[in-house]
Swiss-Prot record:
Family of this protein: Belongs to the TPX2 family.
Record protein name field: Targeting protein for Xklp2
Functional summary from the UniProt entry: Spindle assembly factor. Required for normal assembly of mitotic spindles. Mediates the binding kif15 and aurka to spindle microtubules. Required for targeting kif15 to microtubule minus ends. Activates aurka by promoting its autophosphorylation and protects the phosphorylated residue against dephosphorylation.
Phosphoserine PTM positions: 206
Native organism: Xenopus tropicalis
InterPro entries: Aurora-A-bd (IPR015128), TPX2_C (IPR027329), TPX2_central_dom (IPR027330), TPX2_fam (IPR009675)
Length: 709
């Protein structure tokens, strides 16, 4: 138990408050007051306490025992940090708003300084606390430690970047042995340990910040200092085999450009026995496709609605009220003149007119193309037979035919079957055919298969180029066979007609149409021959008087003047111009003749100005735009003030709610921190009962067939 007590340390004192007691203990929170008094040190004293610690760190005089605090000191500092923050939170409520904001700004600056100091200096490995407690340095509550920066500590200056030549341009020592795989693994392990220590520190800081209740630290975007980093090639990490070189040839000048293309010798593996492995012929090389994650239909619908482009969504009213987007000013460019594509260039009118000879030649060709087709002469006209219209053939009177119903047919067939069954069959033996005794009847002859011609596989290449020779099949002469005599002893049974599918022959509609037209023409000719034309005798011509058709005399072409469109347009214009000239000449003549007009002004009444009968303009009240805008501005400011008041009320409510939640959380945490031991559970005793099953009797297996009956 003593060892267990030494392992655990508690930050808070072991005193507890008895809430059941009636009297109040005023010194219950004395420990928290001590912590806050130790933390609230004036800035002058804090700087004095920090100076020796900083000097000790710079000179490197800090011992490992001092740098590695024990468990007790760490726990005390953690408790001091957490309780100090809680007390600071209590005191901040009494402070004014401006003072509280200043304190928050200072706390953020110190946090940023701590982070920059941690990133600049490499992480030191913490020493594990030994079981034997050694000499420890006294830790003052009020005085900050050398490892952590205070609130008013000056910001450390960044080290200046020193110029250095890159490793590519430096001449490397060829004789330097490359690191083995073990050394590389050790270096990698050290790097991982450093990263782990850094992560632990960050986690501790975040945990302390979460316990204290301060909000997330807002990091200022500080431009980091450029640090020169050497080139690191992947080939340097490979384990290389270095041959033992003689001592005399330690250094040789190597051409850098030529050495770039040379590859290092690959490590030679030791000759070992070949391990036979089975062939995995059944396994394929195809990778198994991973099953896609299940997505519900609701999620698919949501993703589909989100992925729809913006042009298909409804436009918001706010965007429409914003107004049109500012139009970019486009500079005017020079216009490139182009020739117009006029359609009049494509118009072509016939210049030459056809002459009378050409027109006659065309008409003659048209007459020659027309062919007169005479009908055949009916032979009956020349025979002198009496040509009369044919009488239509007299049709026979319709005879009534009864209906052939399927039911009646079936009834008749049944009656016939009954009649046939009634006839007694008498067997009459007939002589056996002699062919059955001499030859084999009813068994088909065995077909002789063709003899296989052997081909060597080595001549396969020759047969690739040459085409296979087509074997000419001999036309089989159809053998005339007599029908076999039926066996008269067996009754005759007719074979049923097999239902065969009709073979579809190729056809074309053009051939069918052509055949139909030929049949139609043939039928028309037959009808034309049957019909007899009515004979109409022509009058006898007068052989004494020859009547010739009148000769048509064509009138000679009369010359007419050309009626041009230009003349039509020019004539009215000329007429109008002549008329204008005549009118002008007439006016000039009239103006040249002087005619004095009578003096009428003397007899007229003198001019008297008249008074205007319009009424005076009535003044109306007006409202200035400035007054209107001033009223609107007052209303707007009033609404803004109301909004700000509402906002401040809401913020105050949220702040009070958060404070109440924090109080509840603190009270809940205090209740949870009190350890309450649970009683040892009591279980029922296990009653061991002996099993009733008999022991198994071993029997030797009979694998052979000798013992089987």
């Amino acid at each position: 138990m003593a060892e267990a007590q030494d392992l655990y340390t508690f930050d808070a004192p072991s005193t507890f408050i008895n809430f059941t007691a009636f009297h109040e203990d005023h010194g219950a929170d004395s420990w928290f007051d001590k912590v806050t008094n130790a933390e609230n040190i004036p800035p002058d004293q804090r700087r004095l306490s920090e100076i020796p610690a900083v000097n000790a760190e710079q000179n490197g005089m800090v011992e490992p025992e001092e740098t590695s605090p024990s468990k007790e000191t760490v726990s005390e500092s953690a408790a001091h940090f957490s309780d100090g923050k809680s007390q600071a939170r209590r005191s901040s409520r009494r402070m004014s708003r401006k003072h509280r904001q200043k304190l928050l700004v200072k706390m953020r600056e110190t946090r940023l300084e701590k982070e920059t100091a941690q990133s600049d200096c490499p992480p030191t490995k913490k020493l594990k606390g030994s079981s034997t407690k050694g000499a420890r340095t006294p830790v003052i509550r009020g005085q900050p430690r050398s490892g952590h920066g205070s609130n008013t500590s000056p910001r450390p200056k960044a080290p200046l970047t020193l110029p250095s030549t890159p490793t590519v341009l430096k001449r490397k020592n060829v004789m330097v042995k490359p690191k083995s795989s073990e050394e590389q693994e050790l270096e990698r392990m050290q790097e991982l340990q450093k990263e782990m220590l850094e992560n632990l520190k960050k986690n501790e800081h975040s945990m302390k910040a979460a316990i204290s209740g301060t909000g997330p630290s807002v990091k200022k975007s500080a431009v980091p200092i450029t640090k020169p980093v050497d080139f690191h090639f992947k080939t340097d990490d490979r384990p290389k085999r270095v041959a033992d070189q003689p001592k005399g040839e330690e250094y040789k000048e190597v051409d850098f450009a030529a050495a770039l293309r040379k590859h290092p010798p690959s490590p030679v593996s030791k000759a070992a026995l070949t391990v036979p492995k089975p062939f995995n012929l059944s396994k394929g090389k195809r990778k198994h496709e991973e099953a896609s994650e299940f997505v519900s239909t609701a999620e698919q619908v949501i993703s589909f609605s989100k992925k729809t482009p913006a042009r298909y969504h409804l436009r918001s009213r706010q965007r429409e009220l914003e107004g049109p987007s500012p139009v970019k000013m486009v500079r005017p460019k020079l216009t490139n003149p182009k020739t117009p594509l006029l359609q009049t260039k494509q118009r072509l009118r016939p210049v030459m007119c056809k002459s009378a000879a050409e027109l006659e030649a065309e008409e003659l060709e048209r007459i020659q193309q027309y062919k007169f087709k005479a009908q055949e002469l009916d032979s009956r006209i020349l025979e002198g037979a009496q040509v009369l219209p044919r009488k239509p053939p007299v049709k026979e009177p319709t005879k009534a035919i009864g209906f052939d119903l399927e039911i009646e047919k079936r009834i008749q067939q049944r009656e016939k079957r009954d009649e046939g069954e009634e006839e007694a069959f008498t067997f009459h033996s007939r002589p056996c055919p002699s062919k059955l005794l001499t030859e084999v009847v009813g068994v088909p002859l065995k077909k002789l298969l063709p003899v296989t011609v052997p081909h060597s596989p080595s001549f396969a290449l020759k047969n690739r180029v040459r085409l296979p020779a087509r074997e000419e099949k001999e036309e089989e002469v159809p053998a005339i066979k007599a029908t076999a005599m039926p066996h008269y002893g067996v009754p005759f049974r007719p074979k049923l007609v097999q239902q065969r599918q009709v073979e579809v022959c190729p056809f074309s509609f053009s051939d069918q149409d052509r055949e139909r037209l030929l049949r139609k023409e043939k039928r028309m000719e037959e009808l034309r021959k049957e019909e007899v034309h009515k004979f109409k005798a022509q009058p006898l011509p007068e052989f004494g008087h020859v009547s010739l058709p009148e000769k048509r005399v064509k009138m000679p072409t009369q010359q007419e003047p050309f009626v041009l469109e230009i003349d039509k347009r020019g004539a009215p214009r000329l007429q109008r111009w002549q008329q204008q000239v005549k009118e002008e000449q007439k006016q000039q003549k009239e103006m040249a003749v002087f005619k004095a007009r009578p003096n009428t002004v003397v007899h007229q009444e003198p001019f008297l100005p008249k008074k205007e009968s319009r009424c005076l303009t009535a003044t109306e009240g007006f409202e200035l735009a400035t007054e209107k805008r001033a009223k609107e501005r007052q209303e707007f400011e009033k609404s803004l003030a109301e909004m700000e008041a509402q906002k401040s009320l809401l913020e105050e409510e949220t702040r009070q709610r958060q404070e109440e939640e924090e109080r509840e959380e603190i009270s809940h945490l205090r209740k949870e921190l009190v350890h309450k031991a649970q009683p040892i559970r009591k279980y029922k005793a296990v009653d061991v009962k002996a099993s009733d099953t008999p022991l198994t009797i071993p029997e030797s297996p009979n694998f052979s067939d000798r013992f089987k009956c």
